[in-house]
């Protein structure tokens, strides 16, 4: 419990990051339709987010090693706010692709920093429980972000301003936390192949989940809209798509912790 209390600020930052980034994808799809973008253009805008996400995974460790965790987080969260605000200033599919690359970098970077901050507090006894709570907050933020779609009018300044505010709010809890950041490593190398070497099953599971989730989160709102659903119904469609995952996180974490304890008991 003490460890969870020490992570409240970080979890609050996670919540605000997800409130902003989780609503941007569906809003872009609906706004693209309102601005007469083609389905291909809307798909490319959604794909650009994940391209930016991959870029963010590579550049964030470099930024951390240069300026530290807090400054890197603030910079990347600000980048997310700027990219959201610029959408209606540049209402063109080409520029939206560029902006979604920037927002993807922002999301990847902010999550990387938060998870680096959390990792030193984990051990084999509490890892499953804390990870479950972390994912519950993360997916609950996604859930609320999908519900926000019912309140955000597509292709309007106010809708994108609200998303930018969420990005800015994510900076406050982490900036004010009393939890000390991890030590800054002198050299960081990102080697994705090591994930497959350590746990092939987990790596392939994440790959499959990423393929399915990215399609749903990018094009789900567009599909629902073209099916004749109202904006409020589109939001419900997206909410129920995320709800099952949100409800499963804490039980999965507890099962992982119990399974590890039993495994260790049998080994001894």
Language-model-derived ranges and their functions:
Residues 94-102:
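Paired small-residue
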Residues 103-136:
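Cytoplasmic helix-loop-helix junction between adjacent transmembrane helices
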Residues 57-68, 249-260:
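Helix-to-loop junctions at the C-terminal end of transmembrane segments
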Residues 164-183:
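C-terminal membrane-cytosol helix-exit motif in multi-pass small-molecule transporters
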Residues 79-91:
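C-terminal ends and interior cores of transmembrane alpha-helices
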Residues 261-268:
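Conserved small/polar residues in nucleotide/adenosyl-binding loops
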Residues 5-50, 214-223:
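Helix-loop boundary and gating motifs at the non-cytosolic
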């Amino acid at each position: 419990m003490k460890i969870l209390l020490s992570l409240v600020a970080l979890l609050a930052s996670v919540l605000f990051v997800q409130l902003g980034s989780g609503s941007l994808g569906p809003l872009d799809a609906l706004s693209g339709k309102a601005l007469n973008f083609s389905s291909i253009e809307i798909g490319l805008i959604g794909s650009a987010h994940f391209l930016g996400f991959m870029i963010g995974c590579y550049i964030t460790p470099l930024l951390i090693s240069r300026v530290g965790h807090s400054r890197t987080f603030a910079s990347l969260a600000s980048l997310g706010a700027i990219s959201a605000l610029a959408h209606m200033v540049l209402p063109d599919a080409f520029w939206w692709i560029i902006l979604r690359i920037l927002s993807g970098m922002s999301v990847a970077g902010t999550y990387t920093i938060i998870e680096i901050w959390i990792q030193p507090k984990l051990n084999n006894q509490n890892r499953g429980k804390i990870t479950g709570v972390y994912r519950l907050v993360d997916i609950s933020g996604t859930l609320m972000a999908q519900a926000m779609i019912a309140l955000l009018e597509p292709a309007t300044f106010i809708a994108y301003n609200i998303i930018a505010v969420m990005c800015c709010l994510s900076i406050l809890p982490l900036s004010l936390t009393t939890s000390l950041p991890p030590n800054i490593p002198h050299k960081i190398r990102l080697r994705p192949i090591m994930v497959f070497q350590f746990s092939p099953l987990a790596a392939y599971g994440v790959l499959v989940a990423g393929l399915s989730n990215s399609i749903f989160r990018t094009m789900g709102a567009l599909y629902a809209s073209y099916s004749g659903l109202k904006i409020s119904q589109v939001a419900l469609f997206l909410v129920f798509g995320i709800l099952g995952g949100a409800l499963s996180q804490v039980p999965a974490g507890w099962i992982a912790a119990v399974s590890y304890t039993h495994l260790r008991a049998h080994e001894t």
